[in-house]
């Protein structure tokens, strides 16, 4: 008889558990209805229970049947997070690279959250003070959104957090004292509008790049020196501000070129350049602000790669021409409009004059122009500047439209266009500078003694980052179908943390399609030989070639057809006799002959227990390079496939997600 009183509570608990599980399913169903406008989840999210029906991206607790993980990255989801507020057992939320909007406030009800990845969305509003309720938080990534307001001091209450990424937002106010967060291993607040003092220890721990793009921040070198001034909002308190008055937060979109002034302690060569600049200013005033500081010689010799010049566009001996040309059509804009940088951020970063006087190191030349590393006189600002060739005549209005397309795209795996300068004879694009070079140099550079091989973990992490960047481009322009147009290993760059970013987006729009396709070389899709057109499907093909390049270690040029095994003695004769094929055809032929192991880069074969992952990646690459465009996967599908390839890494505890950092022993950080 004693068992009967116990039966009722057990039944009540069972009923409660079923009810809560059903509530989770209802919440996810509402989330899909509110956000899945493209129907990406409709075919899989069927059945009455999210857990027992194995819904895509949903993981549940085996015991309670409650939802514990929701991972739906890069699915073009658009809408608010409101319906997720009832998922109180949720531990991991990964919705990066979608188009989600609204605020993050609903998540403060999810008290068990540990890992939150919401980068690359359209979230706005403020970071709520109630975020401190998430006591178990380990990684928080809200980067590349439109979040405003101050960083709440309550965030310092996180005791287990390892990572906080809130860069590329619109955050304002005083920066909190992050030195109080002893567990914090990674912090990035760059490119916001924060002000205040950053302690020496914090700068050393997280690096100065984690605070760049905030003109109001000050502290130890390379940040501006802090000075104490009277707070304009309160006469009773002092305010710490940078000693440089131009560093006080403000938000102009574009800045006019100031008068050139002298600097104490400048070298004689720079003094001469400044004097020349003053003469140029007089010419500008007289002739409608035609270019300030001279130009590099277009027809004569240019500085070799790696040389350093005093002045970014100064010192050339080539013919100088008026911005109005010789009897040609003049620009419709006023002279003053031609003398300014146009920024895509809400605050001024530097003046055109600063850029023109910066020391410049040529990084390389391409079909569109020359790329320089420019270090401004303040010593703390380094950017990459591309000078477009004159072979790209583009009306101002059309050029500005292209720049708007490129500049409005924000994503952690796409190189950010910070500003541009337009004049009829001079076009400059200013990008963030990435110090670790390109994937091409890592794969093919220094193949001799002393080379540090690029390990498998790094390769798959870099390809996943590149795939996410390209998927974001395709999703952002899914209606207009704007492609990248030039996917290749030299356009996959690495930042200081070893994260891959896609470069050169949109610049193919400035070229004639025939010329744009010609520069693709071995990355060109087969249909582009007949139909001279750039497309997103052709991008997928190029990405597939890139995958094969990473797997084989071979550049996408021509290779002997492996019609039979070749001995060392017969190599020379056979190379003359055998037909040559491109990289995808070469890989297919080797696989067809069942010599799959010969496909892979010998540097990879020394690693154990990765054969399945390499073969899986090979299948993804081959799926991307099928000759028929309509049979190729979308980049969103490619991202999913790459994410499913598991790489053995060194976890640090139950909730440590090492895959969010691409850095590996084969990738050393440099300042380039």
Curated annotation (Swiss-Prot):
Entry's localization field: Cell membrane
What does the entry list as the binding residues for ATP?
Answer: 363-371, 386
Q: Where is this region: Disordered?
A: 233-254, 300-333, 650-672
Q: What SUPFAM superfamilies has UniProt attached to this entry? A: L domain-like (SSF52058), Protein kinase-like (PK-like) (SSF56112)
Q: Where is this cross-link: Glycyl lysine isopeptide (Lys-Gly) (interchain with G-Cter in ubiquitin)?
A: 111
Does the record bear Methyltransferase in its keywords?
no
Would I find Signal among this entry's keywords?
A: yes
Q: Which sequence ranges are marked TM in the entry?
A: 270-290
For this UniProt entry, what is the primary localization, expressed as one broad class?
Answer: membrane
- Report which superkingdom the organism of origin falls in: Eukaryota
Bias (Polar residues) occurs at 233-249, 661-672
- Which parts are the LRR repeats? 87-110, 112-134, 135-158, 160-181, 182-205
| Biological process per Gene Ontology, one example term | plant-type secondary cell wall biogenesis
Q: Which residues form the Protein kinase domain?
A: 357-645
Under CDD domains, the record lists: STKc_IRAK (cd14066)
Positions annotated with a glycan in the UniProt record: 23, 44, 101, 188, 197
Q: What happens when the gene is disrupted?
A: No visible phenotype under normal growth conditions, but under short day conditions inflorescence stems of mutant plants show dramatic reduction of secondary cell wall formation in xylem fibers, leading to the inability of the stems to support an upright growth.
Expressing tissues: Expressed in the vascular strands of cotyledons, the shoot apex, hypocotyls, roots, leaves, stems and flowers.
Question: GO CC annotation: what is one?
Answer: plasma membrane
Membrane topology per record? Single-pass type I membrane protein
Q: Which InterPro entries match?
A: Kinase-like_dom_sf, Leu-rich_rpt, LRR_dom_sf, LRR_N_plant-typ, PRK1-6/SRF4-like, Prot_kinase_dom
Check the UniProt entry and state the signal peptide residues, or none.
1-21
What the record says about its domains?
The protein kinase domain is predicted to be catalytically inactive.
Summarizing the function annotation, the protein's role is:
Leucine-rich repeat receptor-like protein kinase involved in secondary cell wall formation in xylem fibers. May play a role in a regulatory network which also incorporates the TDR/PXY signaling pathway and regulates the maturation of interfascicular fiber cells. May promote the initiation of secondary cell wall deposition during the procedure of cell expansion.
For this chain, the family text in UniProt reads: Belongs to the protein kinase superfamily. Ser/Thr protein kinase family.
List the protein's name.
Leucine-rich repeat receptor-like protein kinase PXC1
Q: Which organism is it from?
A: Arabidopsis thaliana (Mouse-ear cress)
